[in-house]
Amino acid sequence: EYLSSFYGCTYEESKQITFKILYGGIPDDIAKSIPFFRKTKEYTNELWSKYNRDNFIETDIYKRKLIKKNYTDMNRSKLLNYLLQAYETECNIKTIIELQRYLYEKKTKLVLYGYDSFTIDYNNSDGVDTLKEIKKILERNGHLTKAKMGKNLGELQSIQDRL
């Protein structure tokens, strides 16, 4: 919503514009007029300098090294993209581990993970508190969630108000 006010468009449209700018490179005029992009461009330049100086960069959570010689066509935008994707993936790995530990002795199971979604096969015998705890796990670190339920993926209905 913050960026949609700068663009003068809807939230959904602003998401598309933002990703296009982030992953395609931040033009100087955008960086000058929108503080978020100014800071992002500064951060990207810092990452790029470190990557070129050290010949690698580490991911934030698991400290995996992206070694320069393994990426022949790397550029600033790609480096930022790779690190953002790595951060999201590594956060989700931690979330999956926490969910699996919580669900270990329950009949409810995590059955599918997609980039920004988790599909849970909920068993009524585990009780609604199980769903509430799953929601808490997913919302750690300030992540927002939407909860839906249905007999299959094509029939999902929101259950936000019940949690």
Label the model's feature ranges.
Residues 1-113, 139-151, 155-163:
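Conserved catalytic core of nucleic-acid polymerases
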Residues 118-133:
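Catalytic palm subdomain of template-directed nucleic-acid polymerases
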Residues 132, 136-140:
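Extended Gly/Ser/Thr-rich low-complexity repeat segments
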